[in-house]
Each structure stands twice: as structure tokens, then as C-alpha cells.
Amino acid sequence: MLKPGDVVALDGDLGAGKTVITRGITEGLGLISEDVCSPTFTIVNEYTEPADKVPVFHFDTYRLSGEDDFIAAGLDEYFYRGGVCVIEWSSVIAGLLPKKTVKITILGTGSERKITIDDPEGRLC
């Protein structure tokens, strides 16, 4: 089970299902998931309702040029805000990810996909 401070890194092509996985994570944590959408232009969306649940901070780093952009925008501070961080296109900031990050890679789109989960602490597997 995911807990405050956990980071989930999602990588896959456009349309692979990264946002769908994020929707499942928010729902699994008891948050309202209908409004989950890719934060391509906002960079980060916060899902915090209901307030008694662990919040999810959902990032899309596709448009960032690298780790320096992430830090300059103060986005690394979300790692310490007591929520679960879910990061689409996480390879853009790979050097900033905590060692215990759950990494999910999605290969393919459409009806056939290969999903690989690297979960160093066994939270999901």
C-alpha cells in the first residue's frame, strides 16, 4: 500500500495509460478520481478530496527540459508534503527520484501493453 512520502514514477509513450494508472492510484487511496487528468500544461495537479485521505500530487514532466527546471519551479518540495507523488515522464528527472521510488514502465498502446513494476520495498507487488 502506498503511504505519505511515496513516489511513483511512470514512463511510457503517449497514450500508454500513465494517467489511467494515476486515476487508479487516487481511487485506491480513497480520493475523488473523476477529475484526474494529465497535468501536461499545469505540470502538477493536486488531488486532496476528501481531506482526511493521503493527497496525491500528479506531475507531468514532459515539457520540462530536465532536473534544473523541476527544482527551479520548486516542484521537488512536493516530495516532502506528506502525499504520494505520481510522476509521468519521470525519466526527465530521474536523478532526483528517491531510491525507494516505485517505477512503472508501460510499453505499447491500445489493447496490448507490457507493464513492468520495479518496487524496491514491495508496496505494490
Give a label for each model feature.
Residues 14:
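The conserved Walker
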Residues 1-5:
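Phosphate-binding P-loop
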Residues 65-125:
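Short phosphate-coordinating micro-motif centered on Lys-Gly-acidic
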Residues 18:
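Conserved lysine of the Walker
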